[in-house]
């Protein structure tokens, strides 16, 4: 399941409880980030499942949405039915929601 950056912006503005999971690598995080995101690189997700909430939506984010779609499907298959993919990733967020987030 996917959500748009507009939907995520609405969730954040409403104060609805959620976790924004940034699965990008550290170098990408240094280039651009969204405040409040939980950073767990994609290749370390399996060993960090205990850091993920089971009682709220998890919005999985990467650069443009490809890796996060894979992680969302994997999480869903491993019991995190509340995981959704952020379409377009941080790139779409920068273009449509917050131009202060650098593009790379």
Labelled PLM ranges:
Residues 61-62:
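Short, surface-exposed ligand- or partner-binding patches at beta-edge/loop junctions that are enriched
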Residues 1-19, 26-57, 66-104:
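Rhodanese-like catalytic fold shared by cysteine-dependent sulfurtransferases
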């Amino acid at each position: 399941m996917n959500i748009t950056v507009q939907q995520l912006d609405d969730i954040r503005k409403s104060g609805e409880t959620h976790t924004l999971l940034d699965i990008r690598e550290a170098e990408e995080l240094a280039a651009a980030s969204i405040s409040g995101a939980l950073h767990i690189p994609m290749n370390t997700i399996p060993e960090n499942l205990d850091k993920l909430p089971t009682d709220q939506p998890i919005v999985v984010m990467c650069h443009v949405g490809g890796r996060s779609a894979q992680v969302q499907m994997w999480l869903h298959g491993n019991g995190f039915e509340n995981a959704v993919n952020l379409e377009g990733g941080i790139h779409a967020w920068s273009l449509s929601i917050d131009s202060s987030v650098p593009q790379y």
